[in-house]
Amino acid sequence: RFKKIRRLGALPGLTSKRPRSGSDLKNQLRSGKRSQYRIRLEEKQKLRFHYGLTERQLLKYVHIAGKAKGSTGQVLLQLLEMRLDNILFRLGMASTIPGARQLVTHRHILVNGRIVDIPSYRCKPRDIITTKDKQRSKALIQDYTASSPHEELPNHLTIDPIQYKGLVNQIIDSKWIGLKINELLVVEYYSRQT
């Protein structure tokens, strides 16, 4: 993880740690001139590691985004941001996306009153995300919310911290994406691969 954040910069979904300010400068001096391919590859890797996806999963999302109406890059980011594990992370119910993924796979999370154990579940507007009524599930979320620093909640989500309940209001707007990334470079990377 630390090698990844040192090379690619801060990845809030992967870890809460930040690279030291001097390490960025050292990397640029050591590496010399960066090729266009390397720039595209680094943007793609940033996206992949932040959301915790395999190469195959990311490629699948790029294909879905390419077939949808609108800008491929914007649609790609919307698809990734509306994943259940990412929504839990953005609501502050988990400190990282891998932590949120673990909550989902261990069946602690309900969507609209039904257990969902698939982290890639695509949330829709008006979905209600809650924890199971079991004490252990509530305790896990309580630990996460108490320990994690509270960032500003995106406007497409609302949370009720007392009932451990989150609501998806709408599809995310591009300015609320939690990662600084040039999504067009990712799309270009894949368009040149095929």
Swiss-Prot record:
Cysteines engaged in disulfide bonds, as pairs: none
Domain of life: Eukaryota
Residues of the S4 RNA-binding domain: 82-143
Cellular compartment(s): Plastid, Chloroplast
Pfam family membership, one: S4
Record keywords: Chloroplast, Plastid, Ribonucleoprotein, Ribosomal protein, RNA-binding, rRNA-binding
Keyword flag Ubl conjugation: no
MF term (GO), any: structural constituent of ribosome
Gene Ontology BP term (one): translation
GO cellular component, one term: small ribosomal subunit
Matches recorded under InterPro entries: Ribosomal_uS4 (IPR022801), Ribosomal_uS4_bac-type (IPR005709), Ribosomal_uS4_CS (IPR018079), Ribosomal_uS4_N (IPR001912), S4_RNA-bd (IPR002942), S4_RNA-bd_sf (IPR036986)
Gene3D superfamilies: Ribosomal Protein S4 Delta 41, Chain A, domain 1, RNA-binding S4 domain
UniProt function note: One of the primary rRNA binding proteins, it binds directly to 16S rRNA where it nucleates assembly of the body of the 30S subunit.
NCBIfam families: PRK05327.1 (NF003717), rpsD_bact (TIGR01017)
PANTHER family: 30S 40S RIBOSOMAL PROTEIN, SMALL RIBOSOMAL SUBUNIT PROTEIN US4M
Subunit structure: Part of the 30S ribosomal subunit. Contacts protein S5. The interaction surface between S4 and S5 is involved in control of translational fidelity.
Family (UniProt): Belongs to the universal ribosomal protein uS4 family.
Protein name: Small ribosomal subunit protein uS4c
